Every structure is written in structure tokens, then in C-alpha cells.
């Protein structure tokens, strides 16, 4: 997705330090950032925030983190958080490679990867969020019962991710090869998902865990 640069976005985000971490001020203190101590779920690459804000509104007993590096998108997530008065959702404006700088070992209960960039060229495989270096970060911060939820419309990325996770020592608790035909009604749409599923795109989804989190 091409992002149109918003020169004012950075200042807008900096005006809300209680909701947005721009420079790691809450690194290692995620639990303390929230009003209540509750399980933490993360979405990496939240886009405009429809998915994560819907989850937060539906589940006040869970604390959510939206992690998105593009400042010109993050402001839309912030707008939704303010409009919906969500106290259980915070935003990190940074790259996923910094995850273990923010979260302690075993601090997270769930990670969502929704419609991540497929980086289709082989030379860019290291940038895929299901490449083994990222999986190692997820394993580090997830607790023993924690899991990873992955959703994409890119068949190649889905196949790659299944293989990458299997080779890393993960197992799958759920796999959907055509989510919108198999959905039990619990699926929450992202903005991207709604747009492309209406055009007939097939959506792939999986849930996975590590055999040994540590």
C-alpha cells in the first residue's frame, strides 16, 4: 500500500504521549502503561486501525498494542482511539524488529499479523514478518500459552509462512484456506480485507503456537 506523506502527522502523534510511543519511552514498561494489568495482544502493521480498535472495544478485559511504523497511517489509528474513548489500546510507532526492546520475555498473549507486505522477491525474504528472525522475536515475547494469528490474501506468502513456521518448530491449531466461506462469524475485517474480499479475493488464515515458547 502506497502511503501519502503527511508532514504534520509526527507532531500530531507527539502531542499524545499518553497514547502513542514515538521514541521508546515505554520500552520494557508495557504493562505499566495501561490503567489495568491485563493480557496483552499486539497487532503488527495495523494500517488504519479498524481491526485493532474493534477488538479493543469488544474486549475491555484485554490490553491491545497497535504497532505501525508509518506515521502517516498511525494518526488514523490515534483518531479512532480518541473517538471511541478506548483506554485499553496503545500505539507504538516503530518497526517490528524492535519488539524485544518494548516487551519483556513472556509478556504477550497473542500476536496478530494481518495482510503483511508479502515482499515477493526472494532477495527480500528477510523482510517478511514470518521470516525466522521475526519468529524468534515472537517466541521470545509470547508466554507459554501465547499464539500467533496470521491472515493474508497472498497465496504465496501464506505457503511461505506455513513452511517457515513449521521449520521453526511451530504447530498449527487452525488453518482456513478460504476464510470467508468457512468463517463462523467471529472474523473481524480489516479495511484492506473488506475492500479486496468484495472483489472476490480469497482470504487465507492460520493460528499457530510454538512447541516450546522458551
UniProtKB/Swiss-Prot annotation:
Pfam families: Methyltransf_4. Keywords: Methyltransferase, S-adenosyl-L-methionine, Transferase, tRNA processing. It catalyses: guanosine(46) in tRNA + S-adenosyl-L-methionine = N(7)-methylguanosine(46) in tRNA + S-adenosyl-L-homocysteine. It comes from Staphylococcus aureus (strain MSSA476). S-adenosyl-L-methionine binds at residues 43, 68, 95, 117. It comes from the Bacteria. Belongs to the class I-like SAM-binding methyltransferase superfamily. TrmB family. The active site is at 117. GO terms for cellular component: tRNA methyltransferase complex. The keyword Translocase does not apply. Catalyzes the formation of N(7)-methylguanine at position 46 (m7G46) in tRNA. PROSITE patterns: SAM_MT_TRMB. Substrate binds at residues 121, 153, 190-193. Its EC number is 2.1.1.33. One of its GO terms (molecular function) is tRNA (guanine(46)-N7)-methyltransferase activity. This is tRNA (guanine-N(7)-)-methyltransferase. PANTHER family: 3-DEOXY-D-MANNO-OCTULOSONIC-ACID TRANSFERASE/TRNA GUANINE-N 7 - -METHYLTRANSFERASE, PENTACOTRIPEPTIDE-REPEAT REGION OF PRORP DOMAIN-CONTAINING PROTEIN.
Amino acid at each position: 500500500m502506497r502511503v501519502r506523506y503527511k508532514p504534520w502527522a509526527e507532531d500530531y502523534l507527539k502531542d499524545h504521549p499518553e497514547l502513542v510511543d514515538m521514541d521508546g519511552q515505554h520500552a520494557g514498561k508495557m504493562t505499566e502503561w495501561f490503567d489495568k494489568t491485563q493480557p496483552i495482544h499486539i497487532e503488527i502493521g495495523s494500517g488504519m486501525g479498524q481491526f485493532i480498535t474493534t477488538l479493543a472495544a469488544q474486549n475491555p478485559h484485554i490490553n491491545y498494542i497497535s504497532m505501525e511504523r508509518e506515521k502517516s497511517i498511525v494518526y488514523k489509528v490515534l483518531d479512532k482511539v480518541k473517538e471511541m474513548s478506548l483506554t485499553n489500546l496503545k500505539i507504538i510507532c516503530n518497526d517490528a524488529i524492535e519488539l524485544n526492546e518494548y516487551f519483556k520475555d513472556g509478556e504477550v498473549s497473542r500476536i496478530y499479523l494481518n495482510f503483511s507486505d508479502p515482499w515477493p522477491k526472494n532477495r527480500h525474504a528477510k523482510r517478511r514478518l514470518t521470516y525466522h528472525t521475526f519468529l524468534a522475536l515472537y517466541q521470545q515475547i509470547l508466554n507459554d500459552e501465547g499464539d500467533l494469528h496470521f491472515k493474508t490474501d497472498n497465496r504465496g506468502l501464506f505457503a511461505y509462512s506455513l513452511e517457515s513456521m513449521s521449520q521453526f518448530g511451530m504447530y498449527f491449531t487452525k488453518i482456513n484456506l478460504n476464510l470467508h466461506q468457512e468463517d463462523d462469524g467471529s472474523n473481524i475485517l480489516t479495511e484492506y480485507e473488506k475492500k479486496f474480499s468484495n472483489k472476490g479475493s480469497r482470504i487465507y488464515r492460520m493460528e499457530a503456537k510454538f512447541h516450546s515458547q522458551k
